[in-house]
Amino acid sequence: MRAIALYSTLFVLIAGALVIVAIHGGTNYAREFVDGYEHSIVRPSKEQQEHEPAAHTTGWTFSHRTQGRNYGLTEEQCNVAFPHLYREIDRAVQHRKDKWGNITPDELETAWRGDGIVRAQIHDNQLYIIDAHGVVDHNHRPRTVATLHSLHRAISAFQGKLPDIEFTFTVHDAALPDSNGNETTWAYTRREHQEKLWLMPDFGLWGWPDVGLRSFAELQEVLEHEEDEFVDKEPKLVWRGSVAVGSKDVRHGLVDHSKGKSWSDVQTLDWANSTNIQERLLSMQDHCSYMFVAQTEGNTYSGRLKYLLNCHSVLFSHDLEWLELYHHLMKKSGPDQNYIRVKRDFSDLASTMDRFSRPANYLQAQKIADNARRTFRERYLTPAAEACYWRAMIRGWSEVQDFQPEFWEEVTEYDKVKKKEVQKRKPRGAPFESYAIMEEVDWQLPAKARKMCIDE
């Protein structure tokens, strides 16, 4: 498929060059035409080359083809491969040092969040779940399971020693029940003023199977081998989503300003209507078959953004109020531009799309798509980068942790051998290996593991 598309493109270029020769009476103009195309889609600018990570001191360099799913990179390799990944961690650490001081055990209480919060610790490179608070419903459960698996993978793949820490994380769209709350926890997203929150990798970087995304790594693999060349994609802007969410303004704006346009494939979804879903829902691979993809925030952040950035397509996005750990890598202008910023109400969408949907501007559009693929799919959104981020977050948290986590707890148990009550020590919580099966911190024997699907 790719070979045919490539030869077709080359044929069109050569034919165009011959026509230009005939019209302009010379070869220089035609050569400039072909050279201009080659340079615009293949060779990064001098500034882009300068932004490439430096080589490892032993000569090691990162390649997404061979290292993209290497979950056990050393700390030095992580810094070489992903030098601009850790801004949110550095910010959170510095904020504690400048304003709040070190993290205390009192800040790890979970009662402030009614549900969807987990307390855990890492001891001797082992993940333990201390309290899984209200995470068994259809929304919180898959997020919790995915996040714990992702964190465990990053820990277990690493051959070095990680610091012992104790922490909490929430799996809500909005970590804080009060937008102006002051709690400290790990979260998927935050607003600019919520500076005590520490941003962790989103659960969707593991997988989101309940909406058809079986594995993030699998999506990247499929796109690497099956995605159409940019020039062969559907030259339209695609979006699917419900308007019954928190960010109604941006979604209604997108729908209103794309209605009836020849370049638009924007359609709303009604999740309560199975016929509507069957007719309109698109897979992420389907989204990547379009030249242009639209991003909107949802109840808070949008879980689809990281997937759309894997497409070799041009992303259109409004300014984002909810931050994720990689948002600072999105460039709206300059030689490294990797998406197109539109107004929050999408009022400038029509004029922008009228420009980029013209075939004469496909080369400029493709350069933006090239930059996005190079930055995200081939580097900063690889599974290897996610694992590196987790470990950097563990190190950063330990830097401002004001206590040594207690691994052991004293309990009174009946000793069947001594036939009396005795004082014993046991680890706090449950090791990940058992929690992954039981989804409980404690259980009675004979045990019964939680069912995979629960009707509510």
Q: Can you name each region flagged by the protein language model?
A:
Residues 2-276, 281-283, 409-422, 441-456:
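Secretory-pathway glycan-assembly enzymes, especially type II membrane glycosyltransferases
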Residues 287-456:
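Catalytic binding pocket for nucleotide-activated donors in carbohydrate/polymer assembly enzymes
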